[in-house]
């Protein structure tokens, strides 16, 4: 029996509607299955979530000594938390970092900091660099003795005698690229980088000349890091300046 034209059109529309509904349900089912498969294949762990960090900072946060991105593995958790917080609050400026942490809670920043603080991959050998003897000597002086005439305390006075940092919030400065060190000390000197007040690093950086900054960075970048080097215990050093980023010990 042949359908009249209006009835045929209605039948076609009903068939088309049913087909589209069936197709949509099928596609939804496939998408759900794919999502379940992806969820099963990628475990929801802190390590997996932090691939956004290790993409730049390297596996476990180890970085390298010949790139711009710093090593964050093994740094004191308090220091790492302070830096993440500073990026979120605008005291440090780097668009990619700000984008990553802009909407993260304090608790999650602390979780990230704790994860990387607990990573201890080996350090690479120092990067090749050949400063002049005068530059090397000036860097050695500033790191280990400071410059009383310019009211510059020795780096070891805050960062520890082995320059491996002090718990809970002072970082070690060895194993970092020279260019990174120059850029960060320079950022404090020109006001682009800030820490919690009183900002002791800003005070020190203001007293350093460009040549001083280059000398310190060259000396630090040339030092090997001993296996098992870690930040020393709280209270191991008496700070020569008040630092808002370092909690006072009772």
Regions found by a protein language model. Give the residues of each.
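Flexible coil segments in periplasmic/lumen-exposed cytochrome c-class electron-transfer proteins
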Residues: 37-50, 59, 92-164, 190-250
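N-terminal secretory signal peptides that target proteins for export/translocation
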Residues: 1-14
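Extended intrinsically disordered, low-complexity coil regions enriched in Ser, Thr, Gly, Ala
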Residues: 76-98, 175-186, 190-199
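The feature marks the first
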Residues: 41-90, 94
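Bacterial N-terminal signal peptides
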Residues: 18-29
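Sec/Tat signal peptide C-region and signal peptidase I cleavage site
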Residues: 30-36
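Short, recurring structural edge motifs at helix starts
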Residues: 66-70, 98-101, 168-170
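Short, conserved sequence motifs enriched in acidic/basic residues, glycine, and aromatics
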Residues: 71-74, 103, 172-175, 207
